[in-house]
UniProtKB/Swiss-Prot annotation:
PANTHER family: PTERIN-4-ALPHA-CARBINOLAMINE DEHYDRATASE. The gene is Pcd. Pfam families: Pterin_4a. GO terms for cellular component: mitochondrion. Keywords: Lyase. It comes from Drosophila melanogaster. It comes from the Eukaryota. Its EC number is 4.2.1.96. This is Pterin-4-alpha-carbinolamine dehydratase. GO terms for molecular function: 4-alpha-hydroxytetrahydrobiopterin dehydratase activity.
Length: 192
């Protein structure tokens, strides 16, 4: 946790200061974008500001006519482009076959994982020292979940974390579930 705070102080704070300085300098030049002229593109994580004609004229007057205002145009991504980008990032995941099940699932079953009745999934309840340790455990797992784009079904109550793993895209267990379960075991063992 301390590492995260230090990282935030050293990385985020200077960048926020740069943004604040940029905003202050644009205000001094008479550039005041209005809400109606501000457009954002969440998919590209960029902010485009289009100044009104009155704001551009005020900037030219304030700088003696030498203000060179640029308009930034974001081309919105179409659904097809977004799908193509996602498809490139995702690897094809397939359901475990019988040989892979026997080979990869058995060590997890020996470690306390159980098969869920009525669906192709595995379940385990992790009992940790207290809520802070349970939350740290979930945070560590969430980092991998985001990285591999595979999120567990879980429930937390004080020091207990119930986890169910299954891959919805293939309708059952996949190598992603095995990887996630192994990571859960490793993370839980580190916290003991």
């Amino acid at each position: 946790m301390l590492l995260t705070i230090k990282c935030a102080q050293n990385v985020i704070k200077p960048n926020c200061q740069k943004v604040a300085n940029l905003l202050a300098s644009s205000r001094r030049a008479g550039l005041f974008p209005t809400t109606a002229t501000t457009a954002t593109s969440r998919s590209l994580s960029q902010i485009s500001v289009l100044y009104s004609p009155a704001a551009r004229e005020a900037a030219r007057a304030a700088t003696g006519g030498s203000a060179n205002l640029r308009r930034i145009h974001n081309t919105p991504t179409t659904e097809a482009t977004a799908t193509a980008i996602t498809a490139k990032k995702r690897k094809m995941v397939v359901r475990l076959n019988e040989q892979e099940r026997a080979e990869k699932l058995q060590p997890l079953l020996d470690a306390g994982w159980t098969l869920v009745e009525g669906r192709d999934a595995i379940f385990k309840q992790f009992v940790l020292k207290d809520f802070n340790q349970a939350f740290s455990f979930m945070t560590g797992v969430a980092l991998l979940a985001e990285k591999i784009n595979h999120h567990p079904e879980w429930f937390n109550c004080y020091n207990k974390v119930d986890v169910t793993l299954s891959t919805h895209d293939v309708g059952g267990l996949s190598s992603q579930d095995i990887r996630m379960a192994t990571h859960l075991e490793t993370t839980a063992n580190l916290l003991k």
